[in-house]
């Protein structure tokens, strides 16, 4: 679950996803799932064949900062589609809202997209109808496992970011190279460590275990059998003993670092930037990290599919996609934005927008499901409901 407005995260349990179907993913040399490699049974939702007349309005569920008058007003003038925005604070809230059938589009993260696809809540997309989905979209955001199923695309990329290790360089005087400073019981910064507060954070523990306990056989942090999940929870309980606080509210995370209660822990690049203090540094540790990637997804019950397609195309342009990325604080999906101005180039450099080598180390949030997405067929993996239940045991 992801919190993207300055409110506390809701602790809502998601319905378990029970998947059946063919074997799972193939693996690339970097160990990430091959695009569209997951084969599972999902509802047969039709794809739009051709565009028609715009309906006059479009209802969108989005993260704060993704739908703003600075670009939505121009869209309305251009298309005649009035934009009605509903800001959501968590992925769970987005899933619930999309299941009402009242919204046409959602800016879904990877920890929501598989739930929406499996529930038949979103429709596959006809990419031929979206002109701005082209060669300028960064390769690392095309055909990803969290929004591409059975060879069909369900999402139009918006932006991405890594869950980085942030530290106070006046206290942590040597740049950390490992997550061990945040996970090990003997960390010299025990009692000054901050951790993310959500079930999906179990994947962060799994990433660390992939490097430190290879005998567990974890090859994808979102594909954990019961033994692997138990190991991740044990590590999280160990970390609980050295954590000063957990954060879901970005404002609280910034305050914790700025006030000195925290000196090291999980962060986003935009949060470090918002501290406006050069003593706060960040690093992507050698073990890699988790991360998030957002995409527009179309409701299977949309009353305004033409306006929705128009919005996905409009916001996919270099200028508008870049405006969204700069407004929120993330790497844009459209690399052409990086060449539009010196300011754009600086933004892209700060957020590693076109650095695929950087993002190859990032495991983007993906909904855990019972079918093992690492390709194993001889074991059942744990699903998001099990992760949610397990997370509740971490903090006691």
Which residues are covered by each model-predicted region?
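Mature extracytoplasmic/periplasmic domains
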Residues: 299-368
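Periplasmic-binding protein-like
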Residues: 131-135, 233-239, 277-300
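Conserved C-terminal helix/tail region of periplasmic/extracytoplasmic solute-binding proteins
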Residues: 361-396
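A bilobed periplasmic-binding-protein/Venus flytrap-type ligand-binding module shared by bacterial periplasmic
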Residues: 166-171, 207-209, 292-305, 323-327
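Early extracytoplasmic/lumenal segment of secretory-pathway proteins
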Residues: 36-116
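A ligand-binding cleft/hinge motif common to bilobed small-molecule-binding domains
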Residues: 112-117, 265-279
